[in-house]
């Protein structure tokens, strides 16, 4: 390991001890915002410190085995060879693990997120596929122990959704789900197709982190137009008799958010404001990213929602992720919620890109 990296790790261990002390300070405990920020930092530093301690222990084992190789006793030298080999591998493996822990993290990775699914080209078939994507994400969330809450939905008469917005709550949610942003194309034979022809349709998915209140963009109330209306279900029939649904328009940007899933107008308004905050923050982040003109390929899709990231081919039972040239003939499993089959290779590729960028900087 490079001495500069080792020194950086020792600084992080010092900071970990400092944060640990601050968290038990009554002044910190009484300041909820500060306590929350330090708790988050503690969790990240705890992981690094723990692995760094393992590294130092593995280094000690390696040094001991190295000394044993120089022993006068041939039996001792023979025994030391295996220990030396194991210790050398352990040092290399833990060094790799530390390298990944030291990669720059997206500060939003631990946040909850909003997922918007919209039916695109393909009419009813696209809406049905939007419903399939919602089911796939719901099953995946269930496996991960995450909680899903539908914020707004516009059902299609033939089944599925013209659009749906959900909130996903859980640990490390945005860090996983952000790779789902982009265009999702489906190829299959619709139930109404008598000739057995394969049709192509598409949906777009947008994933945005939930913005904590402390970090939220300040929105001027004068910039908002708030409308109330009756919540409606599939086909437009009214499902309640009060104007509990909310539509908020942010006049300067033209961003419109609707929420009608809750019976309470107050709850729908709070949810709509959360989604609006996330959309405005996303627009600001995308503007900053495009100005930076990063040379690194980005596996998280940009604001161009038409950018196709994945194809689901049902006749062949195939799913292809175009960003990393991944093809899997396990479509049924993936649609049933085994999304880790796709997510893990994408996250690994993203880590590899970051490591390559880090190597270039050094």
Swiss-Prot record:
Keywords recorded for this protein, A-Z: Cytoplasm, Methylation, Protein biosynthesis
PROSITE patterns: RF_PROK_I
Disordered as annotated region, ranges: 279-305
N5-methylglutamine modification, residue list: 237
Chief location category: cytoplasm
GO MF entries: translation release factor activity, codon specific
Pfam families: PCRF (PF03462), RF-1 (PF00472)
PTM text: Methylated by PrmC. Methylation increases the termination efficiency of RF1.
Basic and acidic residues: compositionally biased ranges: 282-296
Location of this chain's protein in the cell: Cytoplasm
Single GO cellular component term: cytoplasm
InterPro entries per the UniProt record, alphabetical: PCRF, Pep_chain_release_fac_I, Pep_chain_release_fac_I_sf, Prokaryotic/Mito_RF, RF-1
Similarity field: Belongs to the prokaryotic/mitochondrial release factor family.
Record's function text: Peptide chain release factor 1 directs the termination of translation in response to the peptide chain termination codons UAG and UAA.
Name this protein carries in UniProt: Peptide chain release factor 1
Upper taxonomic lineage: Bacteria, Pseudomonadati, Pseudomonadota, Gammaproteobacteria, Alteromonadales
């Amino acid at each position: 390991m490079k001495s500069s990296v080792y020194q950086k790790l020792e600084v992080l261990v010092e900071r970990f001890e400092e944060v640990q002390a601050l968290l038990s300070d009554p002044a910190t405990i009484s300041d909820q915002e500060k306590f929350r920020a330090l708790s988050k930092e503690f969790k990240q530093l705890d992981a690094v410190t723990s692995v760094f301690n393992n590294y130092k222990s593995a280094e000690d084992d390696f040094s001991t085995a190295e000394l044993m190789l120089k022993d006068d006793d041939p039996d001792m030298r023979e025994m030391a060879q295996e220990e030396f080999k194991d210790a050398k591998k352990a040092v290399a493996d833990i060094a790799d693990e530390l390298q990944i822990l030291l990669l720059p993290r997206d500060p939003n990775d631990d946040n909850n997120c909003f997922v918007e699914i919209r039916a695109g080209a393909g009419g009813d078939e696209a809406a049905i596929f939007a419903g399939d994507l919602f089911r796939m994400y719901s099953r995946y969330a269930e496996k991960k122990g995450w909680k899903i809450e539908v914020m707004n939905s516009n059902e299609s008469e033939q089944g599925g959704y013209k659009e749906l917005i959900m909130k996903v709550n859980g640990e490390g949610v945005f860090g996983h789900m952000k790779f789902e942003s982009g265009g999702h194309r489906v190829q299959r034979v619709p139930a109404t197709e008598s000739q057995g022809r394969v049709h192509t349709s598409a949906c777009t998915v947008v994933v945005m982190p939930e913005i904590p209140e402390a970090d939220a963009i300040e929105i001027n109330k004068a910039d908002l137009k708030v409308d109330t209306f009756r919540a409606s279900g599939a086909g437009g029939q009214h499902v309640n008799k009060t104007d509990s649904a909310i539509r908020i328009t942010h006049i300067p940007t033209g961003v419109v958010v609707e929420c009608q899933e809750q019976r309470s107008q107050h709850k729908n308004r709070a949810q709509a404001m959360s989604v609006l905050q996330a959309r405005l923050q996303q627009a600001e982040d995308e503007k900053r990213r495009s100005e930076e003109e990063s040379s690194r390929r980005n596996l998280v899709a940009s604001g161009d929602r038409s950018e196709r990231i994945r194809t689901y081919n049902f006749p062949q039972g195939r799913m292809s992720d175009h960003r990393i040239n991944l093809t899997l003939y396990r479509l049924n499993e993936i649609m049933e919620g085994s999304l880790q089959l796709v997510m893990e290779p994408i996250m690994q590729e993203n880590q590899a890109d970051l490591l390559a960028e880090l190597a270039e900087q050094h």
